[in-house]
Amino acid sequence: SDVWHTAEAVAPKAGVLQAKVHLSGKAKHVVCLTTAGAKKSLHILPAGKQVKDAIYTLVWNEKEAVNYVNDVEVARSKNPLAGEALHLLLRSYLPENVKGTGKMEIDWIRIYTNA
């Protein structure tokens, strides 16, 4: 398991997070915005929607979060982090009882805000 987490908050109450990502292997991959301590999160790579080579986008505001894969909406939900300071978290891990390896290669990550 590998984890990378920003120490300082990177995102305010609303914005856009985009990442151009290449995924491979059996590992599960996470790119998300989290609260301090990672108690709650908004995932840019929605569960079950991971595509090997894609541009993932998360658009969030006080009310909702919308996920896109290659500009196609794949998920929409209430924003559980409304009003929270958010940190960027990257993680790859092998689920329990899964053998093998995996790789997450990131070409770029962009965060746009109205700050």
Q: PLM features: what roles do these ranges have?
A:
Residues 1-115:
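GH16 jelly-roll
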